[in-house]
Amino acid sequence: MNAESCSLILSYISSAPAGNLVLNCTATTNKQTLEANLKSAVYQRYPEFLEDWTNVCVHIIHSYFPKDADYWNVDKLYTSVNRITTLEQSKVVGKEIKNGFTFDAENSTASLENDLQPQFRSHALFMVGSAGPLFSSTARTSRLDSRLPDGGIIAKPVALLPTPSVANSQEYTLDKLSPPSTAKPPASVIEFNPSLAKLPTVKYLQSGPFSSIAPYKNSSSSVIPDSSFHSVACYRASSHYKEAPVEKSIDIDIIQNNLSLLEEDSWTSVPIQGELVELNKLLQHLQLLQNQRITSHNVLSDEERQISVQVQNLILKLAKDYDMSPEDFLMDDFTLSLTQYGAFYRGTLPLSAQPLELPSQQLLRSQSNAALRSNSLSMNGSLSPSSTNVPLQSYRRTTKSRR
């Protein structure tokens, strides 16, 4: 690199928009301005000039931001001067390794010296969201600017890899570094099935001080009313014998002839005694849990819910195994009346203030009593005891009796 080359480079830089800004910078090796070094032809070789040229441009780039005009003017000037210097250097020295690039004097093309290491080209902001990793658009900065984009405390900067080529499939890509988010695996424990919840039953009423005479339940909203409630504790013996399988050694005609001797209303529970005992234990345990929950005002526990499901499944199993329909084991005298805690009042209803007899009936009865007294005096000569003149129905209740 001679003095003529230095003067040509000086004239080209000074004609650029940001030339004076670069020439007056002192970020060189000897702490002199770049203009002074070019005028005095300090640089004997192109690598010496390129080293100071890069340091000066990096220093100025870090003094500005991408939104400033001088930031991009210096970036364009650095690229053009670096390209011109590289071409001049290739003409003089032929082939020379420079900054990791191999320059060919014939076609003046640059290729990467080491393709194994990924070359970072840009940066972006990265954050983890509810739907997976989120990336911002690439930051438009100069290659000389080593500052990372600032995302504050929300996002962090991340370097972006170049687009992978078809020939080299071993390069790291963004998909390999940050795979897409997958759905959360399902829970191993299955929650309670709402379809097994108990059906709406009878609603009990609170009438306050009138609980002794007012209705205590309302079955209009229940799925299974009182009249359709059936028991699976027993079944008709005749229906069981008709549907039961008969061994070949037994005469079927004898059984068929004796079916009429069985009492149609007879009941039996021997074959399902074990299931009934288990059902009774579950019902007792369920009643104990319900009483504890009602007295302590707690929410429905999982144990109580599971026991109710077991009771429901056991009842369905009994009905299915013995092929019973609701009409088969209907009990007419079965009641669903349950004990309900409420206000208790001692005493009786007040007496009726007015007798139930009409005045004409009362007058007729008085006259008959007087006639009886006169007959008794004429026969015995003395007054015999007789009933008082009190209406017979004066102590009857005026309200309807409770049942």
Swiss-Prot record:
Subcellular location per the Swiss-Prot or TrEMBL entry: Cytoplasm; Nucleus
Signal peptide residue numbers = none
Q: Where is this region: Disordered?
A: 376-403
Q: Which domain of life is it from?
A: Eukaryota
Q: Which UniProt keywords apply?
A: Chromatin regulator, Cytoplasm, Nucleus, Phosphoprotein, Transcription, Transcription regulation
Q: How does it assemble?
A: Component of the RSC complex composed of at least arp9, arp42, rsc1, rsc4, rsc7, rsc9, rsc58, sfh1, snf21, ssr1, ssr2, ssr3 and ssr4. The complex interacts with histone and histone variant components of centromeric chromatin.
Which protein, by its recorded name, is this? Chromatin structure-remodeling complex subunit rsc58
Q: Which organism is it from?
A: Schizosaccharomyces pombe (strain 972 / ATCC 24843)
Question: Which lineage ranks, top first, belong to the organism behind this chain?
Answer: Eukaryota, Fungi, Dikarya, Ascomycota, Taphrinomycotina
Q: Which gene encodes it?
A: rsc58
